[in-house]
Amino acid sequence: MAINAQEISALIKQQIENFKPNFDVTETGVVTYIGDGIARAHGLENVMSGELLNFENGSYGMAQNLESTDVGIIILGDFTDIREGDTIRRTGKIMEVPVGESLIGRVVDPLGRPVDGLGEIHTDKTRPVEAPAPGVMQRKSVSEPLQTGLKAIDALVPIGRGQRELIIGDRQTGKTTIAIDTILNQKDQDMICIYVAIGQKESTVRTQVETLRQYGALDYTIVVTASASQPSPLLFLAPYTGVAMAEEFMYQGKHVLIVYDDLSKQAVAYRELSLLLRRPPGREAFPGDVFYLHSRLLERSAKVSDELGGGSITALPFIETQAGDISAYIATNVISITDGQIFLGDGLFNAGIRPAIDAGSSVSRVGGSAQIKAMKKVAGTLRIDLASYRELEAFTKFGSDLDAATQAKLNRGRRTVEVLKQPVHKPLPVEKQVTILYALTHGFLDTVPVDDIVRFEEEFHAFFDAQHPEILETIRDTKDLPEEAVLDAAITEFLNQSSFQ
């Protein structure tokens, strides 16, 4: 058999042409330090800031510090199996979380993994946790109200869709209750709610989830939880995960309410990470970019232009103060980023005034333009009246004689305080808020004993539901008050047949 050299060379040539190398090139490094949710690695020459990295044990990390000799990495998950000398690989991707409709009604961790025991979440959509906020020309001014169902907020410090309203106060002053009540009030309001629990006790989160489920609010709510027992990288990441999920809905033209409970714990977690990464500490040992930590998060809440779908993200960030000190570092940072704040005083809370909103220190910078006409008319002077009542009340403690005008102001003030009280998890529709506040500001409650105000209000709402539903309907549909004579006649009719006259 003759060997044909030409055939053999053609065959070899064909084999070479058809050869496909079965390998992929991945840049790897070596772990040089591990501990407290932080790793350092050598050899990742081209890694990007914020890039996702893969450890040998399957855990992921995120590149934070890019230094001349090594890379500082925060570990997202369990770091107990990682050892010095382990190999670490680049993924070439930045941190992304699952988003979309299938997350609604679920409880997830900051990586988007379910923690409620209800099985896998099936979604093929993801969004990066860090994303640029909408630009100046991509935004619209706040014009639609977000009804919290709480008289004290909707009347005194109204919130609009797309606003950032800080809720600030000491621990145990009812901050979370305000947020949960606001979420409950979004039922049938075409809103999606996201509750981000940062550094909370797991038992507390369980209680909140059960409350939401009991009132049917879990049907339109996503809960993101990073409990106190989890490593600080997850606490740092949780708010960004929540807002990434919210952005998916906002850019579809939907309206979202997101609650960050609370950002003080996120700042503490970030301080811990920064100190472990050897970043230079600043005031109160926080790193220099702690303002940017919160500003880049809260700037992603907006009312976007019609070209982008006209959706919105309304943010309710929480800050916990120490002994009512709202001039602390993190508190003043967040106050300067947000569009107003609701200050909860422990003195008011302990005196039984709940929600314990301090009208003097609370403000809504843009919510006034979103308030409905009816509420503007009845609550126009309520803030000033309440503030002057508190001032007068302080003076009366000295026991001086009072003229009739001052006495009338004090009487109206006491009734105002009683009307603005509200039981837990009982948000009130805006049309009912308007009717009771109208009765208050037009002097119909001046003869009702202060101790009977709560009972008066219950019977008052029941009367309007039964006898005058058309008045409530008019307020709900037109967003304005009906003729004053109609309202006055209805309230007088109630007073005549009640025991309060």
Curated annotation (Swiss-Prot):
Annotated ATP binding sites: 169-176
Pfam families the record matches: ATP-synt_ab (PF00006), ATP-synt_ab_C (PF00306), ATP-synt_ab_N (PF02874)
Recorded catalytic activity of this chain's protein: ATP + H2O + 4 H(+)(in) = ADP + phosphate + 5 H(+)(out)
GO CC, alphabetical: plasma membrane; proton-transporting ATP synthase complex
Topology term for the membrane: Peripheral membrane protein
Site for Required for activity, residues: 362
InterPro entries: ATP_synth_asu-like_sf, ATP_synth_asu_C, ATP_synth_asu_C_sf, ATP_synth_F1_a_nt-bd_dom, ATP_synth_F1_asu, ATPase_F1/V1/A1_a/bsu_N, ATPase_F1/V1/A1_a/bsu_N_sf, ATPase_F1/V1/A1_a/bsu_nucl-bd
Chief subcellular location: membrane
The UniProt record lists the keyword Phosphoprotein: no
Annotated compartments: Cell membrane
Molecular function in Gene Ontology: ADP binding; ATP binding; proton-transporting ATP synthase activity, rotational mechanism
Domain of life where this protein originates: Bacteria
EC number in record: 7.1.2.2
Keyword tags: ATP synthesis, ATP-binding, Cell membrane, CF(1), Hydrogen ion transport, Ion transport, Membrane, Nucleotide-binding, Translocase, Transport
Assembly with partners or alone: F-type ATPases have 2 components, CF(1) - the catalytic core - and CF(0) - the membrane proton channel. CF(1) has five subunits: alpha(3), beta(3), gamma(1), delta(1), epsilon(1). CF(0) has three main subunits: a(1), b(2) and c(9-12). The alpha and beta chains form an alternating ring which encloses part of the gamma chain. CF(1) is attached to CF(0) by a central stalk formed by the gamma and epsilon chains, while a peripheral stalk is formed by the delta and b chains.
NCBIfam families in the cross-refs: atpA, PRK13343.1
Similarity comment: Belongs to the ATPase alpha/beta chains family.
Function: Produces ATP from ADP in the presence of a proton gradient across the membrane. The alpha chain is a regulatory subunit.
Protein name: ATP synthase subunit alpha
Organism from which the protein derives: Streptococcus pneumoniae (strain CGSP14)
Encoding gene per record: atpA
